[in-house]
Amino acid sequence: MERWISPGRSLGSVIAVIGALLVASAPASAHGDSRGHGDHGVVRAALPSGAVKHIFVIELENEDASTTFGPGSPATYLNGTLVPQGELVENYYATGHASLDNYIAQISGQAPTEETSADCLGPSTNLNTLIGSYDDLLPGNLDPNQRLYPGQVDGHGCIYPAFVQTIANQLDRLDPPNPFTHVAAWRDYDEDMGNQPTGRELGTPDPLGGLDCAHPALNGPDNTNAASPATATEPADQYATRHNGFVYFHSIIDNTAECDANVVPLGKVAVGAPSWFDGTRLPDTFSGHLVNDLRNPWTTPKFGWITPNLCDDGHDSTCAGPNTVGQIGAGAGGLHGADEFLAHWVPLLEASPAYRLGQMMIVITFDEGNSGDGTACCGETPGPDNATPGFSQLLAPIYQQLGLPIPNPASGGGRVGALLLDPRYIEPGSVDTTGQYNHYSALRSYEDLLGITRGGTDGLGHLGFAAAQGLTPFGRDVFNRPFRRFLWR
């Protein structure tokens, strides 16, 4: 599907480029203090709005920065190839434990609740099936203390009411979806989504395979927490609803046509085999939504989110289905599996016209660190419904069943690190040891960079805790490359 291009877009793009030329060399502090006219001193990302036209986030699972990027890391492609191409932000932090709350935070600024911190598992969850819940968050009202809890919603449950906005809704207002195809300026790509449509999740059959906007029945059980091996008629399904933050908002799932058009399966890669001639690996062959969207800058979404399956994101060490290169079972996942995913899918992004033109930033990070790391940064405060974002007391009985020590109450999700790739604005091979950022900082940065400067919790384009006073978005320590004329790579 082609993305909707509003009339006059080309003129706006020219103006944005001229603006970038004028301000790229303007002085700024190391921590992004660019201030727009009329912004009342709000701290914004160091680059001008519109300088980065496309942002893609690849979300991996459950590793500390010291393990991922340290000596002896099994992520050899990440460290040996990608880190030299971009900037490693060492002090990047998750905002909670376990998974779901971090996915939600990065697109909405909503803080962990007891339920989202527990991945919507309950104290009586059967550890053999890991069946969770997909329940509305009730009562779902704005917290009365908006000074302390900006944009935060009170309640218990997992699915936010329709008035709670995400960066997807913000982009819909800024750049309305195509009125015929409903394709928007954002897209969420989920590997394996709908591989086994019978009994795991509900959705609309996608013409390219899988299901669109796939999630459990509202207020019903969630059967996707554990991967499902292949059957006689269906491939393995390693999609986990809890790793798809977009389907936890009624503002997205209630608009069926738009959700179907934009919450889509990632697609497939056929890994190139060694050449019979000289043994060099032949090119990979891709199919599906992502490769189709990347063919032109005007079909590439402004904001793209990529969630690998439970093996390829590193969550599962022993995999019920194949990783990117076809390995199954013990050792197929973990950082090794995540690294194989990056080794094949990141080159696809980097080969896209949008990236080669210097218009795209790629962010590779992790939802959370290991459960023993509950550190936080950036003045993170808990939300109104969970005083300890680093651990939900709903999980205590499960820890006891497993014979594991119950973690101490913690304030965050640990130091996970992030790698940012941008051929125009980031110096290859650089390491940021001074900046401190978290998932809320990232959301604030995405909003600023993509031109979302109105609305939101603060009226200046920032949602939830991304609007927290004093929160720092990506600054000159991140966008550290001196401006130069950029040519097609």
Where are these regions (language model features)?
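N-terminal pro-sequences and low-complexity stem/linker regions of secreted or lumenal proteins
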Residues: 30-489
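Secretory targeting and sorting signals
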Residues: 2-31
